[in-house]
Amino acid sequence: NDIAYFAVPSTHVDKVQVMCGKSSFKVKNIMIMGGGKIGRLLAANLQDDYDVKLLEKNSEKAEQINDKLENTLVLTDDGLDIDFLESENISSLDCFIALTENEQINIMSSLLMKHYGVKQVIVHINSTSFFKVVRRIGVDAVISKNTSAVNEVLKIIRSDEDKLTVSRFDEIDIESVEITVDENSEYLRKELRISDLPSEICLAAIKRNNKII
């Protein structure tokens, strides 16, 4: 039940999937559950490149959303009606994204989608304490507004003239640090080896002239 994390160039993601025994696939059909601000913005950004369906349980709100999203099919449902979901052929979905404000419903619907064989399931939760649990039950990705907000604050208060970027990953209790090294950087004042790094630090990648070395 181990979870492995890889730092790779985006062009090599397919190779990692194959190495881990997971075949890559192209996303075409996407279903978003939740017509809140995040769901609407996401649908608006995806609808021109993908076949997008958006579920909103409030019929009046669904009608308003439908008027604004020309290339998104807006449906009225809470995401837990099995008969309705089967009528929408959910087993053919490439990606399901649960974005309601109710994290219990998000988790339940995500488990249901996994049961029906949806290739990629993404769930939004409010409490970061659920991160590890949700990942363990088979959800492919977990997002949280709280974590996103924390990351943005970290980037601001711990930045050094845009030379250092910090991001936090609460589900594994680590922080990633991206450092831009220039000719005046203190990091170049002495020769460093990977073996010189403290045991708590792992060097993931070095990028030079737009290439990973």
Please give the residue ranges for each predicted region.
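Cytosolic regulatory regions of ion transport systems
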Residues: 1-213
